[in-house]
Swiss-Prot record:
<dbReference type="Pfam" id="PF02639">
    <property type="entry name" value="DUF188"/>
</dbReference>
<dbReference type="InterPro" id="IPR003791">
    <property type="entry name" value="UPF0178"/>
</dbReference>
<protein>
    <recommendedName>
        <fullName>UPF0178 protein AHA_0543</fullName>
    </recommendedName>
</protein>
<comment type="similarity">
    <text>Belongs to the UPF0178 family.</text>
</comment>
Amino acid sequence: MPIWVDADACPIPVKEILYRAAHRAQVVTTLVANQGLRVPPSPFIKTQQVEKGFDVADHVIAQQVKPGDLVITGDIPLASWVIDAGGEALNPRGEIYTRETIKARLGMRNFMEELRSAGVQTGGPAPLNAADKQRFANALDKWLIRGKLS
């Protein structure tokens, strides 16, 4: 039950939560990015640097994820691929994507992309706040506990 992290866009506070959880729960956590990453020394924390390019890290994660794995990503298409592969996807704000919710999220993402391509200013997500970090940590802990019980 490893954890994969779409690390290029993952906020630093979320990575720090993941580092502590990987060490505490002794779960292999692999951060995939198209740039070098500094991570704390740990046998449970690994990095995988991929070529620069659009969605390269996403494709690498999607190819390696197995049923039961957890992927940390805010990328909706990657989350959909993960769910289709039998994995679980959690975004940095603590929302778990499910088969029931991912299609609606994909539809909204595509709609917003169409608006942006038509020149409509849609804004971006709000900055990560303390409640988001707490929600993420709680969702991660629930996943880790479920994994230990199975």
